[in-house]
Amino acid sequence: MINESVVLVFVEEEAEKNSIYNTIEKIGQVCNFEEQKPFQITKRLKIICNNYKVNVEENVLQYLIECCGTNMQDLINETRKLIEFAGENGKIQKQDIDKLCIKKIESVIFDLTDNLGQKKVKEAMDVLYNLITAKEPVQKILITLYNHFKKLYFVKIAVANNKDVATSLNLKANQMFLVNKYKLQAKGFKTSELRKIIQELQDLDYKYKIGLIDLNVGLEAILCAYCS
């Protein structure tokens, strides 16, 4: 026996309006669930905080999203942690996020690169050592650094040629807040410097794979050489 109503869920990057789509739309109802944009996520997190009588500024919630990503379940878990720490009638501060929340490696790499752009070698090395101490695989750190510097290079090229940065980086609708962060950070590097760092990270990966160098030593050498 067929139920009177059936819910079909299709998970796709984009809704392709083919014959199946058109048929379903004709005889039923189509509802498209887009990924939430940062302002929508901020609004939901604010409601959660209000329910527990905890105050938080919008810019602090935006910082939480920058640090922890846009996955709603991750953000709810981190928000609950912050709510417990602040307590009823308390207030969540930016420094609470730095102390308590589990940051995405991409966010930490942003911090590391900020320090590199300002030639702060000690601070950059501290971020690297903290990642290693947190048991983050060094190979993953290398790959994330490489991808990050590639994005900064793409930003430089896009800005120089009056191209759209979001399109050049293939950012999703809920990642648009990253555009200004990338543009601001890219200003701290020359295009030639970014090319050189990217090449050095590629060379390090190759030398590591053939057993010529330790990854930790190689990363430290690249970071220190840039800041010198």
Task: Describe the predicted segments one by one.
Residues M1-D114, K187, Q202-L215, A221-S228:
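Non-catalytic interfacial helical region
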